[in-house]
Curated annotation (Swiss-Prot):
One of its GO terms (biological process) is fatty acid biosynthetic process. The active site is at residue 49. Belongs to the thioester dehydratase family. FabZ subfamily. Its EC number is 4.2.1.59. InterPro entries: FabA_FabZ (IPR013114), FabZ (IPR010084), HotDog_dom_sf (IPR029069). This is 3-hydroxyacyl-[acyl-carrier-protein] dehydratase FabZ. Involved in unsaturated fatty acids biosynthesis. Catalyzes the dehydration of short chain beta-hydroxyacyl-ACPs and long chain saturated and unsaturated beta-hydroxyacyl-ACPs. It catalyses: a (3R)-hydroxyacyl-[ACP] = a (2E)-enoyl-[ACP] + H2O. The keyword Lyase applies.
Amino acid sequence: MTIDITEIMDLIPHRYPFLLVDKVVEIDPNKSITGIKNVTVNEPQFTGHFPARPVMPGVLMVEAMTQLAAILVAKSLGSTKNKEVFLMAIENSKFRKVVQPGDTMHIHATIDQQRANVWKFSSTVKVDGEMAAESKFTAMIKDKS
């Protein structure tokens, strides 16, 4: 099952310039998800990071991983219309390859553990089949107030 950008925008609240998942290419609810982010030179972060040699900031790669995980949560629960997903912890992030405009980030997230409203994930970003980044993180799912 694929999920296009229109449905992604129904599932998570992020918008330009902070929406960092372009498409979901595979999903197994309650287990894992794979998506893509096409990195383009016209994104605002490249104005300052770095003008002479644009490089995707590592923190935005982690953000893309967490957004993909939030989509997995929404599909696993059936909906997150009345829920909010909050990041609680980021652990063991490693950045192994420079990501730059023209690259396609292949992002994968797996649910490692779910207890009540706390979910733990492992995630990777690959470019051209090579590991670019990896991280583990924890999120809390809360009812909207």
